[in-house]
Amino acid sequence: MVPCWNHGNITRSKAEELLSRTGKDGSFLVRASESISRAYALCVLYRNCVYTYRILPNEDDKFTVQASEGVSMRFFTKLDQLIEFYKKENMGLVTHLQYPVPLEEEDTGDDPEEDTVESVVSPPELPPRNIPLTASSCEAKEVPFSNENPRATETSRPSLSETLFQRLQSMDTSGLPEEHLKAIQDYLSTQLAQDSEFVKTGSSSLPHLKKLTTLLCKELYGEVIRTLPSLESLQRLFDQQLSPGLRPRPQVPGEANPINMVSKLSQLTSLLSSIEDKVKALLHEGPESPHRPSLIPPVTFEVKAESLGIPQKMQLKVDVESGKLIIKKSKDGSEDKFYSHKKILQLIKSQKFLNKLVILVETEKEKILRKEYVFADSKKREGFCQLLQQMKNKHSEQPEPDMITIFIGTWNMGNAPPPKKITSWFLSKGQGKTRDDSADYIPHDIYVIGTQEDPLSEKEWLEILKHSLQEITSVTFKTVAIHTLWNIRIVVLAKPEHENRISHICTDNVKTGIANTLGNKGAVGVSFMFNGTSLGFVNSHLTSGSEKKLRRNQNYMNILRFLALGDKKLSPFNITHRFTHLFWFGDLNYRVDLPTWEAETIIQKIKQQQYADLLSHDQLLTERREQKVFLHFEEEEITFAPTYRFERLTRDKYAYTKQKATGMKYNLPSWCDRVLWKSYPLVHVVCQSYGSTSDIMTSDHSPVFATFEAGVTSQFVSKNGPGTVDSQGQIEFLRCYATLKTKSQTKFYLEFHSSCLESFVKSQEGENEEGSEGELVVKFGETLPKLKPIISDPEYLLDQHILISIKSSDSDESYGEGCIALRLEATETQLPIYTPLTHHGELTGHFQGEIKLQTSQGKTREKLYDFVKTERDESSGPKTLKSLTSHDPMKQWEVTSRAPPCSGSSITEIINPNYMGVGPFGPPMPLHVKQTLSPDQQPTAWSYDQPPKDSPLGPCRGESPPTPPGQPPISPKKFLPSTANRGLPPRTQESRPSDLGKNAGDTLPQEDLPLTKPEMFENPLYGSLSSFPKPAPRKDQESPKMPRKEPPPCPEPGILSPSIVLTKAQEADRGEGPGKQVPAPRLRSFTCSSSAEGRAAGGDKSQGKPKTPVSSQAPVPAKRPIKPSRSEINQQTPPTPTPRPPLPVKSPAVLHLQHSKGRDYRDNTELPHHGKHRPEEGPPGPLGRTAMQ
């Protein structure tokens, strides 16, 4: 029996929780050590603090408590003896052991899995084992059994060793070598019992069995090592894709242990199968040239381009192969203009209008033209951008890519073979966020396919996948990895040209069924390096059943903890920190948590596509919101129907009932099949599609697809020699401290890990201080070591990340891990940093301080993913671009007021939405237009604080609420408080908290804006925006005849209050310096009682002064407005007519339209203050319609 105080592989935080519940000094438990294999940790509670002592085994498998130098060590043959000894007083511990904390009773009330053995009782979750579970190893806790329980009589049966000896004697062993037979007998007689002890204590190690198998396989391993090179040479001989000059990498034979043996045998069988396939393909198809290009036919898009307010239809033809963008006025007409790929500088997506795109092109006279087009829908625009990116990539002069596209697919096949045609899955066609037809011919760089309940063999499934991809892309993809656990499988395929860019391939699996061995649930994973970027992929099948949510959560934690992928040097970090990009997908089995009697109501909502109502009850979204699973992961918005449980061979009916022996079982329609991802901070990743197919119906699940753009780095070679002065880079952390949620009484130190460091760096111990709410604050001050990167070129160093682990000095166990990006907008400057700390998937605290980065001289080249940017215009409506939510704000830095003033911008200064808070980037403008700051655009310091991300979960995660009832969805005006806020993280454009701006209920009309250059479209009611007369004096511009002002984007909590920004803008309006503040007058004639419409940004407390909005485009030259005195402002009364400011030059048609309807608008009774004068030519302020609602 395992003692009640032995808790096996529970986490440190769980141990602290159990001890804290008892509240008694001397309470104790033993758990497995997280830092040393086969070691244990003795945890003792004393005065509400947890003290941890390490229990180490020696070479003779005797146990001792690690002690300080000079203290004599006591050894014990069993853990029980050690615990009994330290129950005595004054034995060296902080207090003697008194109250053992028993194991928690596991919830066994749920029905067993449909496909598992019901008669087996499920013990606590343990790590994967290397041998089948025996009866003795199942006894995980002391439970009183009745006489009817057959296990109660196990003590009267022969021992396991005797039983196996009898079995060995009955076997024919005449063919066994004598030394092998003797080794087996020795193992059964003495060593089996010792291995059994390891199993009982929850260890996954069986050292004596490994020694036995190593001895038995010694000669076989040598033969395999000698045979493999010959087979590999034969395989390369028939490989059509391999370059002739490529030489195989030398392989160093590893140790002849069972793990290496299994790996080599698997490699041997795979090679034999591969050689046969390659010879067949070569004889059938003949040799083909390596890196055969895929031909993408020209694609034509019908768009609208507006001129003087009149839309004109045009044709944009993208010829990827020739590298041209052709512009035609009619589909069958001659070419009007064309631009080569070198002349196309940038694509700028409108954030508010999802079908609008700006193209920046360079003319022959080296001028920059800004061309605006409106596509039929957002999918067409996205397809156009992908084709242009493909063109840029195809004709790029860079030897290595800096962005790749990844396809992720997950499908529970329901133990049924697939249909003949599954290409819609790989084309991302069906429901949800799908790809446009124009992108069909663009192959992804990497395809990752995860299946569950897969009835096919690996060879059969691989042939189907490759054939389907070749049918739609004309590319023969290379197999990177394939790994199977029971019926859970993951396949990774890559383009042939990427074969030599992929290295360090690793596969692993974790069982999460009954006792971690029985059943069919678990996970398989693959990881590899793509040049300098680490990628990880996990396909999991979690426990089924709507009521088993907690067990699913535990499945996730076990996979997270025990899946061994990636760089083994990153031992303190689990898979969520080991990869630049980690993708987790599969049949996660989280359900819609509603009563069974609402089944028909659910189906009706699905038919009406009311997914938001159902997603508010989605278990996975709820658990993520409460930070119980998938902490800091991302998921694209779900806009497709639930993928489970359908009647087979149709997608029109959900089969939500199933008759079982125990009664009727309900499986309400749910989104069981999901794709989530987690990337390092400030790394480019955009989800381009997320949906499910509608035509693959052999299973009760529908396949789910997701596609991503992901930034990658190359294997960088420094241009500077190691001896040059400017190559000495340095990373310095200053005034750093960690806040931990722990009751442990120990000292802490930091470890810094990174691929840019030669090896990890360890710091000195920090100073502990008591924090608020029982937290512990560990301050490191100026004692942290200065890190020396191996390469200091900024092109390399700014793409790197530093992984931080805070560890206990006593046990060397990690208490939290975090990640810091080195992509800083300024070097040689101290900048604030922040990262949350997590451990085993739980939030354990945070780390913050300052960083100073020193690089060598050099420039960073523009990345391919910078070619497509998102213009930060006004906050968009309900359908914002989801690419802007591709980073968790918890991963960003809390940086306050560090945006330097910006007086102008260039083409490359448009912020990438995935590089939130990086520098003072702003929107582009033609280079031949001189840029000047207007008084409304004085530089303002913005905060880069990133708040914890809770809001993005749910049906409308990260998006702004719908447009208020009285607010028109479209306005031709843009608003930008200042130039400096161009560095504001785009996420602030997506969230408009309802509590912001409540004191700014007064809706302020505003004047026409003569300072703007042509915007995305023109409206005749507002006049043409094509000319730029000089601005009117400020005194005249403040007259109450201006049209309604659009509400500016409201930042999330944690961002600098917009009231601060607007105050500074007001100071600029009055011509005052920032140090001299003038109170703004309250113009009551513009006060509006509507609280839901037209609020000024973020709570403008002055509430009175109407301000001229500044276009999100860069301003044109303008004279400084006349500064009115306070008396002049106060003398302005709305009923008194005031001189009108000069209006922009308008076309005759526009003037006629305004003159003919001006008085009707002026006299309209819907105006909020129809007693006030308005000029006839002025357009009606939209405020008039909203104030009455």
Swiss-Prot record:
UniProt xrefs under PROSITE patterns: SH2
Name used for this protein in its record: Phosphatidylinositol 3,4,5-trisphosphate 5-phosphatase 1
Keywords: Apoptosis, Cell membrane, Cytoplasm, Cytoskeleton, Hydrolase, Immunity, Lipid metabolism, Membrane, Phosphoprotein, Repeat, SH2 domain, SH3-binding
Composition bias type Polar residues, residue spans: 931-943
Membrane topology, as annotated: Peripheral membrane protein
Location (main, coarse): cytoplasm
SUPFAM superfamilies tied to this protein: DNase I-like (SSF56219), SH2 domain (SSF55550)
Motif placement: NPXY motif 2: 1019-1022
Ranges of residues in domain SH2: 5-101
GO annotation (BP), single: apoptotic process
Annotated family: Belongs to the inositol 1,4,5-trisphosphate 5-phosphatase family.
Short sequence motif named SH3-binding 1, residue ranges: 124-129
Species lineage: Eukaryota, Metazoa, Chordata, Craniata, Vertebrata
Post-translational modification: Tyrosine phosphorylated by the members of the SRC family after exposure to a diverse array of extracellular stimuli such as cytokines, growth factors, antibodies, chemokines, integrin ligands and hypertonic and oxidative stress. Phosphorylated upon IgG receptor FCGR2B-binding.
Tissue occurrence: Specifically expressed in immune and hematopoietic cells. Expressed in bone marrow and blood cells. Levels vary considerably within this compartment. Present in at least 74% of immature CD34+ cells, whereas within the more mature population of CD33+ cells, it is present in only 10% of cells. Present in the majority of T-cells, while it is present in a minority of B-cells (at protein level).
UniProt-listed Enzyme Commission number(s): 3.1.3.86, 3.1.3.56, 3.1.3.36
Subcellular location per the Swiss-Prot or TrEMBL entry: Cytoplasm; Cell membrane; Membrane raft; Cytoplasm, Cytoskeleton
Residues covered by region (Disordered): 103-132, 870-906, 922-1189
Motif (NPXY motif 1): 912-915
Residue positions of motif SH3-binding 3: 1040-1051
Phosphotyrosine: residues carrying this PTM: 915, 944, 1022
Domain note: The SH2 domain interacts with tyrosine phosphorylated forms of proteins such as SHC1 or PTPN11/SHP-2. It competes with that of GRB2 for binding to phosphorylated SHC1 to inhibit the Ras pathway. It is also required for tyrosine phosphorylation. The NPXY sequence motif found in many tyrosine-phosphorylated proteins is required for the specific binding of the PID domain.
Motif SH3-binding 2 per record, residues: 969-974
